[in-house]
Structure formats: structure tokens, C-alpha cells
From Swiss-Prot:
This is Small integral membrane protein 28. The keyword Transmembrane helix applies. Keywords: Membrane, Transmembrane, Transmembrane helix. It is a single-pass membrane protein. It comes from Homo sapiens.
Length: 152
């Protein structure tokens, strides 16, 4: 190995060149390899941008449009709110001496309130209060209490 390192290129010649100008002269044109690397540098940036423009950007746009359409679909198909809104038309100047009763004029009987937990014939004080302490202690544990129980 020392023999190879100690040997000089002068022993073997200048590899077929007629003069030694190539040692002292400045380089003229870049080598073919460096020219190819330069074009690869330009094409590599184009190769970096191409997957973004062809794959990632359209996929992102389609995903955004899908979420937008899903949001609009759910918004249009959402059920109406559960509360019932009604309006009362009151006269601006009621006749003098006449007492107007507003509640009988409302159409309570025509509408059932589906969100009410009470049965239609139940009133709050009569059926849905818990039994008194005396009634609860008098009844045996096996009997049904007379309080508010869901009707099936």
C-alpha cells in the first residue's frame, strides 16, 4: 500500500495527454456530469411541486368540499325545534268595561304537547306529588303507591 501511495503520477505519465496544460489552465466548460446535475436540480424542484399539484391539492379540495356538503346537508335536514311558538293577536284598544279572558281563546285542546311528561288528564297538584309520610308508612311495601306512575 505504501508503494502505491509513494508512487507518483509522473512515473506513469499524463494519461495520454500531450501537454501538462490541464494542470495549470482554468477550466473551460463544465463537465458533462455537472451539467446533468444542474438540470437535475431544476427538475428536482419540479418533481417536488408536481405531487403537491397533482395529488395533495386536489385531495384537499375534495375533502373540504365533502365536509362543506355534509354540513349543508345536516343543516337542511335537521328536525324543527321542539318548542311550539304561538302568537296572540290582541286588540290595541279593548272595549271599556269588558274583561277579556285570553286563555279560553287559545286552541289548547286542538294541540297535544308531545314533550310534556304528564298524561293529558293529569294535573300537577292532584297526581304528581309524592305521597305524604303517613301514607307512605301506612302502605305495605308490596302495594303500588298512588303517586305519579307512567301509564303503559
Amino acid at each position: 500500500m505504501r508503494g502505491l501511495l509513494g508512487s507518483s503520477w509522473k512515473k506513469f505519465g499524463h494519461a495520454g495527454r500531450g501537454t501538462y496544460e490541464w494542470l495549470t489552465s482554468e477550466p473551460g466548460l463544465p463537465l458533462l456530469e455537472t451539467q446533468l446535475q444542474g438540470t437535475q436540480g431544476v427538475s428536482s424542484t419540479q418533481e417536488d411541486v408536481e405531487p403537491f399539484l397533482c395529488i395533495l391539492l386536489p385531495a384537499t379540495i375534495l375533502l373540504f368540499l365533502a365536509f362543506l356538503l355534509l354540513f349543508l346537508y345536516r343543516r337542511c335536514k335537521s328536525p324543527p325545534p321542539q318548542g311550539q311558538v304561538f302568537s296572540i293577536d290582541l286588540p290595541e284598544h279593548p272595549p271599556a268595561g269588558e274583561v277579556t279572558d285570553l286563555l279560553p281563546g287559545l286552541a289548547w285542546s286542538s294541540e297535544d304537547f308531545p314533550y310534556s311528561p304528564l298524561p293529558p288528564e293529569a294535573t300537577l297538584p292532584s297526581q304528581c306529588l309524592p305521597p305524604s309520610y303517613e301514607e307512605a308508612t301506612r302502605n305495605p311495601p308490596g302495594e303500588e303507591a298512588q303517586g305519579c306512575s307512567p301509564s303503559v
